[in-house]
Amino acid sequence: MIAPAIPENETDRIAALYELRILDTPPEDRFDRITQLASKLFNVPIAYLALVDSDRQWLKSRCGINLEESTREVSFCGHTILGDGVMVVTDALEDERFYDNPMVTDPPKIRFYAGMPLQS
């Protein structure tokens, strides 16, 4: 497993995230509708909207997964925020970043991943 690097804009990114005051807030229908729609549109069992804090990935909304947060070290989203576009992992077992990641080897046993960084 390769832990995600820290993006060059980390200080500004974290400041913008905290300014939103969204971390650790209760579920909201407006976000849940987005994740449910994504699950249906892409025909995938799991969809979530995650925010990457300094040491964790926190799921604001999710469907098909009971996870509320994970360490940033094992997060797929930690890798996604390193770029500006869509990140696709077609088979996590064959990707050097993820093949031995506990999110891949243990439940939820992620195989396919597609993510896009959120920007404020």
Positions of predicted regions on the chain:
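Signal-transmission linkers at sensory-effector interfaces
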Residues: M1-D29
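Sensor-regulatory modules in signal-transduction proteins
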Residues: L118-S120
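Regulatory sensory and allosteric helical modules in signal-transduction proteins
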Residues: A15-A16, P45-I46, V52-R62, L67-A114
